Structures are given as C-alpha cells and as structure tokens.
C-alpha cells in the first residue's frame, strides 16, 4: 500500500504539469515529483542513493527557480486543477487494480498459476510513467504560451 501511495505521488505532479502554464506551478510539480520519487526509491534501495538523487534534484530546481525569478515572473496561475486530480485518481485506481492481480503463464501444454513478479511490475510502471512524462513535455512544447516554446528564428 505504501508503494501505491508513492506511485500516486509520482503521477499527480505529471498531470499538474499537463495543465500548468505558470512556471511556479511547474516548479511546485517538479519539487513534488522529485520528493515522491526519492521517497519511493529510498524505500526500495539504499537511502544514500536517494539522498544523492535528492540533492541533484534540488540543484536542478534551484536553477529553474532562478530562471523563473529573472525571466518570467508575471504569469497568472491556472485554476483548472480539478481535471488533474481526476486523472491522478484514475491512475491510482488503475495501479491498484494491476498491483494486486495474478497472471497465468502458459508453459507448453500446462497452465501454471503464478503471482506477478515485483520487478516486472516496477518496470512496467516506470515505462508508463516515462510515457506520461513524455506527453507532458510535448504538451508544454506545443502550447503557445509555454515557457519551453522554441521560436523558429532562434533555431
């Protein structure tokens, strides 16, 4: 159950990034994402690895905060976070269904009943998570009012 909570904490900021145009909301989503990822990783691996990763995340967040303060400080915050909450709730429900299921493995003519292997479940979750983050970044790049917009004259 604790793993499910950390996974929900990883997915919610990604959906916040999909709706967030304000750089400060993106900064908050990135901070939440990094904190949940480090807590989740610290529960599976060595806590020293999680500490080092958190320090790297905080360094990146500080660079982003300096960028926000100097370049784009006059954005208005978005009020459409209810859809993000709905998406995050749906993702948590989907994960809770897939985490507790068992699978059938067919070996030759015998059908053997085994439980889902935990590392495979983590690998599937991380690949889905990477896909969602990819869609969030693409959505930010396509949005015309986004910070990450690349102008054709600069390329």
Swiss-Prot record:
GO cellular component terms, semicolon-separated: mitochondrial membrane
Record-annotated disulphide pairs: none
Entry keyword Flavoprotein: no
Residues passing through the membrane, by range: 24-44, 51-71, 88-108, 118-138
Primary localization class, coarse: mitochondrion
Subcellular location: Mitochondrion membrane
Keywords in alphabetical order: Electron transport, Membrane, Mitochondrion, NAD, Respiratory chain, Translocase, Transmembrane, Transmembrane helix, Transport, Ubiquinone
Topology of this chain in the membrane: Multi-pass membrane protein
Reactions it catalyzes: a ubiquinone + NADH + 5 H(+)(in) = a ubiquinol + NAD(+) + 4 H(+)(out)
Highest taxon above the source species: Eukaryota
EC number: 7.1.1.2
MF annotations from Gene Ontology: NADH dehydrogenase (ubiquinone) activity
Family indicated by similarity: Belongs to the complex I subunit 6 family.
Record function comment: Core subunit of the mitochondrial membrane respiratory chain NADH dehydrogenase (Complex I) that is believed to belong to the minimal assembly required for catalysis. Complex I functions in the transfer of electrons from NADH to the respiratory chain. The immediate electron acceptor for the enzyme is believed to be ubiquinone.
Name by which UniProt lists this protein: NADH-ubiquinone oxidoreductase chain 6
Protein source organism: Albinaria caerulea
């Amino acid at each position: 159950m604790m793993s499910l909570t950390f996974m929900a904490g990883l997915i919610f900021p990604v959906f916040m990034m999909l709706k967030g145009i304000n750089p400060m909301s993106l900064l908050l989503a990135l901070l939440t994402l990094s904190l949940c990822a480090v807590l989740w990783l610290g529960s599976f691996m060595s806590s020293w690895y999680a500490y080092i990763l958190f320090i790297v995340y905080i360094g990146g967040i500080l660079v982003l905060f300096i960028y926000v303060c100097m370049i784009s400080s006059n954005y208005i915050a978005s009020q459409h976070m209810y859809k993000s909450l709905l998406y995050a709730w749906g993702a948590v429900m989907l994960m809770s269904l897939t985490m507790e299921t068992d699978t059938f493995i067919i070996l030759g003519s015998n059908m053997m009943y085994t439980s889902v292997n935990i590392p495979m479940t983590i690998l599937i979750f991380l690949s889905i998570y990477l896909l969602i983050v990819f869609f969030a970044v693409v959505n930010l790049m396509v949005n015309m009012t986004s910070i990450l917009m690349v102008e054709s004259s600069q390329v």
